[in-house]
Structure formats: C-alpha cells, structure tokens
C-alpha cells in the first residue's frame, strides 16, 4: 500500500490551484498533478541509484504552455488519438470539432481536453483517486 500526500504545486493562469499528489511505496515514488491528471515524476531504483524516468516540467505555467501541443504524462480525452478532419458522424448528424493537430485533425480531445482540466484528487485506501466531470 502506498503513502499518499498532497502539496500545492501552483496555480493555473485562471487562478485554479494545482496540487501535486505524491505516492510513495518502498523505493518507488510517483508524483501526479491535478492539472491534466499528469504524471510529473516517477522515481525508480536503477544501477546508478534512484532515477526519475518521466520528462516533466517544473511549473504549472510550463505545463500550460506545452499542453497545447504536447501531452507529456497527461491524461488525454475525451478521445485518445486523432479524429480525422476534425469531424465525425453520429446517428446521421455531423459534428465539427476544433482542429488542433496539423490544422486539420482533432487530437486527444481538442484544445480544452482532459489534459488541461484541473482534476479533483483524494486518497482512498492507500491509492490516489482522480476525478473529473466533463460537461456535455
């Protein structure tokens, strides 16, 4: 079972608090941000000692900047991968989305996907639980 702790990491440009959630189990430590449900760091034992195997940023501002084009460690959605031509048909109706990939496709939920949401976090029985309600 992991030890779970919470610490303020910073604020978004909209003034929302972002928590850094730390899970520690033995020699392993994972750090997850509530911004984007993002895995920021994962420390693991290696020959050279404990090493971080995640490419992460040092501030909420940097995560906000890169989250428009990169998805380092983030939870993506509503859709994972590309929706070609940023549109799809469902039950005979065509839905047009914002093209955020190469100017023609919708990638990983678009410009305001799950990777840009501030998630709720709580500890439950030694586990980290992140939740986010995506409005229709």
Question: Could you describe each region identified by the protein language model?
Answer:
Residues 1-136:
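Surface-exposed acidic/polar loop and edge beta-strand patches at domain peripheries
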